[in-house]
Amino acid sequence: MSSLLLDNIGELVTNTAAGEGPLGIHRDAAVLVEDGVVAWVGPNGSAPAADRRIDAESAAVLPGFVDSHAHLVFAGDRAVEFAARMAGQPYTGGGIRTTVGATRAATDDELRATAHRLHAEALRQGTTTIEIKSGYGLTVVDEARSLRIAAEVSSETTFLGAHLVPAEYADRPDDYVDLVCGPMLAAAAPYARWVDVFCERGAFDADHTRAILTRGQAAGLGTRLHANQLGPGPGVQLGVELGVASVDHCTHLTDADVDALAGADGATVATLLPGAEFSTRSPYPDARRLLDAGVTVALATDCNPGSSYTSSVPFCIALAVREMRMSPSEAVWAATAGGAAALRRTDVGRLAPGSQADLMILDAPSHLHLAYRPGIPLIRQVLHNGVPQCRP
């Protein structure tokens, strides 16, 4: 058994009931890690001996970020589309087809290089658990290979064959849904933990969404959903009805949508993706409204080449505080424990005996600095499964 002691922690965020406030903060604390798992959390003066030691030098220590919504397997970029949008052209989601064409044309090694590069980029910024979706292949072969590559990077992989109806099926959406529910799902399921649908105007309607999620669930996959990004729609309430783990975007919500999420009592998380609103110059979700209603909220990057090309959870925390009326503590919780809830994980997003030893040391005395000092590389060191990773 190998052990590691992280001591002289000025502020330790645990996300447990044992500490101070909703973040479970401990002051002047230490953490003992044994074989990649947290074995003990307590006062610095009572810290047990260990094989190795890391001195936090009075800095803040947090659980690793849990990014529960990302798209890392793709080819090309859409910088020109971004520039055009900033010049006043509205985003309608059609640009996804540009990435589909590039992804289909790319080699496995090219897709693999992008996925690994973005994963490493996220890790340097404190993300130790990341969900990765397919959705830029939209053929049986390309969706399966996208998920196979994603599975090399993360155990949290999501089949998103229902990202958009591809051009070759534009006049036959029902036929494409049959393909997604049949051969595509069969090819993708061995590499996926989740199934997702983009339930939105111009993509998939409620009937198609229900059919795909129901079939995916029957194949043993958990369910998640993109909904209510571009406008009001049936997605949020349908997601709650079907018991999906997370409804993502939630930008345009009715009172009935909020009531449905609140009534789910945490079983369906509202995952907010402020990077998408930043990059599309769109209205931000009203996180305050959701939190005040008792909805469980997660924050994620939506890292993708079209509408949110960022892998930085700290950037999304700053946006959430500045633009979505979240407190810094609420935003940090949403990016750690909230993300874990969106993935139905209890072993990450918190620091307590038995949890995975995924954590970060900040170059700051408090978690507040993540929102207070936007754009500054505050992650001093990241540990994943108790193993120090490359420094930023």
From Swiss-Prot:
Cellular compartment(s): Cytoplasm
Origin superkingdom: Bacteria
Chief place of localization: cytoplasm
BP terms from Gene Ontology: L-histidine catabolic process to glutamate and formamide; L-histidine catabolic process to glutamate and formate
Keywords: Cytoplasm, Histidine metabolism, Hydrolase, Iron, Metal-binding, Zinc
Bound cofactor: record note: Binds 1 zinc or iron ion per subunit.
Enzymatic reactions: 4-imidazolone-5-propanoate + H2O = N-formimidoyl-L-glutamate
EC numbers on record: 3.5.2.7
UniProt-annotated binding residues for N-formimidoyl-L-glutamate: 136, 304, 306
Reported cofactor(s): Zn(2+); Fe(3+)
Enzyme type, top EC level: hydrolase
PANTHER family in the cross-refs: IMIDAZOLONEPROPIONASE, IMIDAZOLONEPROPIONASE-RELATED
Similarity field: Belongs to the metallo-dependent hydrolases superfamily. HutI family.
Name of this chain's protein: Imidazolonepropionase
Species in which this protein is naturally found: Salinispora tropica (strain ATCC BAA-916 / DSM 44818 / JCM 13857 / NBRC 105044 / CNB-440)
